[in-house]
């Protein structure tokens, strides 16, 4: 595992110069409650925050997604906090076009768009009441930039180590509402015959898309406080709903669909 090699290297350093390690986790780690209870598609009122609730975030159950890797990073930062300064950035649902040379699309919105096009109707898990927090990829990149700038300045005002856990979000979305929006846009462009949304069980959606029950049916609500307080971060890019149409059109092009085209077979995508 790459993180194991990195953290082992940090522990083995024989230097008195501080080193900074910024790790990317993900708020899939917060879905463990619905996964444990099998309450997919249901409303959860639990909201995690990275300021008053940071101790909870750094001691989540070991079986939570990503938790094993988070622990490696946290332990590395605890060995010698003066010399190894770690930060964990934990993004929620990421949307919007990337600016890098490689992959420029994320997972959840493009995945739901592609699934809608394949099935020929909108998709939701259970009652569709699951909330996820979300962030535009370019707002997210600002968090990394500000952390790197702080590290270059000797740590700056940023939090590191046990306190260095950063959410990055610009509000919540409700997956049933997003599924409806995707269906409306797909129908407007003639890719599907109606705006109908069909509810599937967790097992059914997993059979159609790997980890679909977690991606669109398990709650992940986060409140980004730390980045604003210590880094001055403020999200300014368009809301997720404003980017859904572009995401769907990209997926339609990838699937070689044209307006009015029948749905593609699930095995063709």
Where does each model-flagged region fall?
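A conserved pocket-lining segment of Rossmann-fold NAD(P)-dependent short-chain dehydrogenase/reductase
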Residues: 111-138, 143-147, 158
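Terminal hydrophobic/aromatic helix or amphipathic segment near a protein terminus
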Residues: 157-158, 165-223, 237
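Conserved loop-to-helix N-cap of the C-terminal "lid" that shapes the substrate pocket in Rossmann-like
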Residues: 88, 103-109, 133-141, 145, ...
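Glycine/proline-rich active-site loop of Rossmann-fold NAD(P)-dependent oxidoreductases
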Residues: 82, 96-110, 147-165
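Amphipathic terminal alpha-helices
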Residues: 237-269
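Non-catalytic, hydrophobic alpha-helical segments
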Residues: 140-144, 168, 178, 227, ...
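NAD(P)-cofactor binding segment of oxidoreductase domains
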Residues: 1-49
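Active-site Tyr-X1-5-Lys
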Residues: 53-89, 94-97, 106-110, 114-117
